Amino acid sequence: MRLIDQRYTDCPFYGSRKMTIWLTEQGHTVNRKRVQRLMRLMGLEAVYPKPKLSAPGQGHKVFPYLLRGVTIGRVGQVWSTDITYVPLVSGFMYLAAVIDWFSRYVIAWRLSNTLDGSFCLELLDEALAQGRPEVFNTDQGVQFTAAAFTGRLEAAGVAVSMDGKGRCLDNVFVERLWRTVKYEDIYLRGYETVPELTRGLGRYFPFYNEERPHQALDYRTPGAIYRGGLAQAH
């Protein structure tokens, strides 16, 4: 499953057929049905090219995408969230995070062994305890279209924006974060247990926020940009 996750991170347009061919080329004997089952379990689907870790909830309200053509020019203008699969030596977890688009600052993150919406609500509450963005962007997954989630945002006076179906570029900053976290930490460390993963990410995200210079930020850190933006706002 780790190989599938790593290849999908590089090639999110891979479906089960291409993934099976690639695994075979790497010397792994596996049939396509098994690859299909594993990709479904991991929430991965080659749909231009969005990983399908969540699906729209029946009867849930889907909000329009508010950010097409919008220039992101300040801290707190847009926050967004997403969920990704995290492989362990034995098993896996799901990771969700909230990121500020302008600064790339990770405001909050949380792990879960299921895709139950409660851990997304807990993540949202943790993020909102630190501030209120103007717009909060998500995909159309059941966790994020649930009335409990969107209601929290509306009650806080935050506009809700949702990606167009299958459009990963609508939430590109979180997608880039996942690639960075996986290649700089998760794949390198090869975490065996949930406590190890939790401790490891507990070290990595402060490093990402406060020590790792970001090319798109003129080699400043997300934390420096985020705090500077908050200071200007006040």
Cite the ranges covered by each PLM segment.
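Charged DNA-binding/catalytic regions of mobile-element recombinases
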Residues: 1-234
